[in-house]
Amino acid sequence: IFEALAISDIKAAADLLGDVYHATGGRDGFVSLEVNPHLATDTGGTIEEARKLFGAVNRPNLMIKVPATPAGIPAIKTLISEGINVNVTLIFSRGVYESVREAYISGLENLSNIGGNLSKVSSVASFFVSRVDTAIDGSLEESDQHLIGKSAIANAKAAYADFQRTFSSGRYQTLQNDGARVQRPLWASTSVKNPDFSDVMYVDSLIGLDTVNTMPDVTLDAYKDHGNPNLTLVRDLDDALSHLNMIEKAGVNMDELTDKLLVDGLKAFSDSYDKLIKNISEKRATLLVEQQSSD
C-alpha cells in the first residue's frame, strides 16, 4: 500500500515540476524518492529497489535517494552506470564525499563505455550542514567556545573546493565533452539550531555556482526577508581550512562525529519509515473492520 501511494504521489509531483525540468534542459525540476532505509547496509537490495522504483515512476525528473553508507556507495556507481538519477543523501564528511564523487565519475565512465547518453543522467550530493555544528559545538571545551558555530560552514566550504577540483579535472572533462553533468552539491539541514546566530547564516554562507539548497519554509521566509544573495561559498577558504585544523587540535575527532551523525540519520529515516508503515497498517485494519461491520 505504501509503495503504491508513494509512487502515485511522486508521479504527480514529477509531472507538476515537468515544465521546469524541460525548460531548464533537464537541470532542475527533480523529485526524490528514497529506497527503503532498512536497505542502507545492503548493496544488492538497494540496487534492486532503486531499479524497481525508477521504472515504476517512469519519469525523467525522478532521483532515487540513496544514503552514503559503505553499502550505498557501490550501489550509486551501479545506478549511475545504468542511467538512473541519484540523490546521494546523509553526507557529513569530506572523506565520504570523496567516495561519492568517485562513485559518480566511475558510474558515468561505465555508462559511456556502453554507449549510454550521459546528458540524461543527473545526481546531487546532499551534504548535511547544521547537524555538524550541533555535534561539534557540544564537544568543545570551555576554552574553545570561540570555535562554536563555524565548523559546518567551514566543512561545507572545504567540500565545495573538493567539488571544484574533481569537476575541473581532465578525467571529468572527457565525460563532460560527451554531455555529462556535474554532480551538484546540495546543502541540506540548513535551518539554524542555535538562537545566538542569524537564522539565515547557513543559506547566506553557502551560495555558489552549481549548488542546490533545500530549506524549510521558516528559513525560506527568513531569507526572503533579510537574506543577502552573494557568491559567498568560495570566500575565505583558507580561514575555513584553518578552522578545521583548530577543531582537530581542540581534540574533536571529526571522522568519529560524522560517522555517528550518519548512524543517527539512518535511524531517524528508519524510524520515520516504520512509523508510516505502522500508521498505514493500522488504518487499513480499521477500514477492514468498518467494512465488515457494514456488510
Regions found by a protein language model. Name each.
Residues 1-75:
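Active-site beta->alpha loop and helix N-cap motifs at the rims of alpha/beta catalytic domains
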Residues 179-285:
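Flexible, acidic glycine-rich loops studded with aromatic residues
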Residues 33, 64, 79, 216, ...:
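Conserved, mostly hydrophobic/aromatic
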Residues 290-295:
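Acidic, low-complexity intrinsically disordered tails
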Residues 26-31, 58-62, 82-84, 119-123, ...:
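Short, well-ordered coil/turn segments that N-cap beta-strands
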Residues 12, 16-19, 48, 52-55, ...:
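Alpha-helical scaffolding segments of alpha/beta enzyme cores, especially the outer helices
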Residues 2-9, 13, 41-45, 89-92, ...:
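Catalytic cores of large soluble enzymes that bind and process phosphate-bearing ligands
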Residues 85-218:
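Catalytic alpha/beta core domains of metabolic enzymes, predominantly
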